[in-house]
């Protein structure tokens, strides 16, 4: 734990240094451009040298795509989100709006990116990355939108701060296969997932607002990737009204592990991720489920065959405490057309059929698939994977007993006793 805290202190210091460098003497080269000089900007990026500050003045710039690679100490700054706008709507080639690869010390802040065909900004294999005061938006939120609005992947030491993402057909703010990341004071609206932490270790997500998405916040570990995630904390977030239709691209549905599996009305979903702590969050009016904790087996019966050093399908060491959770009186309409959504509806119906005293109560706030390491070890231990819940109130928890869902005698259980923190 001391090493973890020290790492985050170092990240915070590094991030503040990179993001707050304002004087030109912090960079060997300072370049400044205005709208209408797009060709000069593209040429400058092709010949960019280490330690360069690029200032984009207020106005709208139209680009096909921009690329930066194999550099150190680079700053791209605008006049502010909504003031400096990079418009990729006429893009004729390239997937991303901005692609950054192998840059050590990269900061981008103070601008809006909009309407690329693929991801709006993808930062790959880079270190000491700061994305601040950035809006990343698609004008139309549907399956034609790019997958990720803000997308650092395979990076180290990432700070995403005071950003806004809208319209992504996968995740508005996504951090993938990264070591050490902070997402704070951001907003995500009208995406499939507001924010996703995937196969990422040592991440903190706090003081954010994720609302009006299909699902508010996802913590996923997926197979066949180069890095194992874990040690993720999410706290002081406001996740509300995430009830919208899942408009992920078709290849993201079913057993292909994509975000298409996220049911409309999901607040937080933990999938096959371990060492996770959720606390002091307000999880309000996500009307299918506040928190779901599920294994890889929940969406792929062959998950065991995918196990290796970077992937273990059972979530372990999950600590849920001191969250405020509320749901409305009914599922969102979109849930009835979604494959995972139909499962959640079935759980609620089965609980109420089993126990008329529930008087048609809603599905409990926390849903656990109940698939444990016992399926791998043939053991019989109760709560062998340390799901630890410290929450109070009625209708709090359901163990879905997902392995028996297809059986006639299937009985989900609302007994939280084995999972109350000792």
Where would I find each of the regions flagged by the language model?
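Sec-dependent signal peptide recognition
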Residues: 1-7
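Right-handed parallel beta-helix/beta-spiral solenoid domain characteristic of secreted/periplasmic
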Residues: 21, 27-39, 53, 73-117, ...
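Extracellular beta-strand/beta-solenoid scaffold signature
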Residues: 41, 88-99, 115-122, 143-152, ...
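Short, T/G/N/S-enriched strand-turn elements that build extracellular solenoid repeat scaffolds
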Residues: 41-47, 62-70, 76, 87, ...
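Right-handed parallel beta-helix
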Residues: 73, 77-83, 104-115, 127-140, ...
């Amino acid at each position: 734990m001391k090493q973890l805290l020290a790492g985050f202190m170092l990240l915070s210091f590094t991030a503040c240094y990179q993001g707050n460098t304002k004087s030109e003497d912090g960079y060997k080269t300072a370049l400044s451009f205005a709208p209408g000089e797009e060709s000069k900007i593209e040429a400058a990026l092709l010949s960019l040298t280490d330690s360069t500050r690029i200032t984009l003045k207020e106005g709208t710039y139209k680009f096909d795509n921009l690329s930066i690679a194999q550099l150190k100490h680079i700053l791209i700054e605008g006049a502010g989100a909504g003031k400096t706008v990079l418009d990729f709507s006429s893009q004729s080639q390239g997937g991303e709006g901005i692609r950054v690869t192998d840059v050590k010390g990269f900061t981008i802040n103070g601008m809006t990116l909009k309407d690329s065909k693929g991801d709006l900004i993808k930062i790959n294999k880079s270190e000491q990355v700061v994305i601040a005061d950035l809006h990343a938006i698609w004008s139309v939120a549907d399956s034609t939108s790019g997958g990720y609005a803000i997308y650092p992947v395979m990076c180290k030491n990432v700070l995403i701060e005071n950003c806004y993402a809208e319209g992504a057909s996968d995740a508005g703010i996504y951090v993938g296969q990264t070591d050490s990341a902070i997402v704070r004071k951001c907003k995500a609206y009208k995406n499939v997932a507001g924010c996703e932490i995937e196969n990422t270790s040592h991440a903190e997500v706090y003081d954010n607002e994720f609302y009006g998405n299909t699902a508010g916040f996802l913590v996923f570990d997926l197979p066949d990737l180069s890095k194992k995630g874990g040690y993720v904390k999410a706290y002081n977030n406001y996740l509300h009204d995430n009830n919208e239709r899942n408009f992920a691209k078709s290849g993201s549905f079913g057993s292909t592990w994509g975000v298409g599996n996220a049911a409309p009305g999901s607040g937080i979903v933990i999938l096959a991720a371990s060492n996770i702590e959720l606390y002091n969050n307000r999880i309000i009016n996500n009307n299918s489920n506040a928190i779901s904790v599920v294994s890889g087996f929940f969406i792929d019966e062959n998950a065991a065959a995918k196990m290796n050093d970077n992937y273990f399908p059972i979530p372990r060491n999950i600590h849920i405490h001191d969250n405020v959770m509320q749901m409305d009186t009914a599922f969102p309409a979109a849930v009835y057309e979604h494959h995972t959504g139909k499962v959640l509806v079935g759980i609620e119906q089965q609980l109420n059929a089993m126990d008329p005293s529930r008087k048609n109560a809603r599905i409990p706030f926390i849903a656990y698939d109940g698939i444990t390491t016992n399926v791998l070890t043939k053991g019989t231990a109760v709560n062998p994977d340390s799901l630890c819940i410290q929450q109070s109130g009625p209708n709090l928890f359901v163990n879905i007993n997902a392995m028996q869902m297809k059986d006639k005698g299937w009985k989900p259980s609302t007994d939280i006793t084995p999972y109350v923190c000792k």
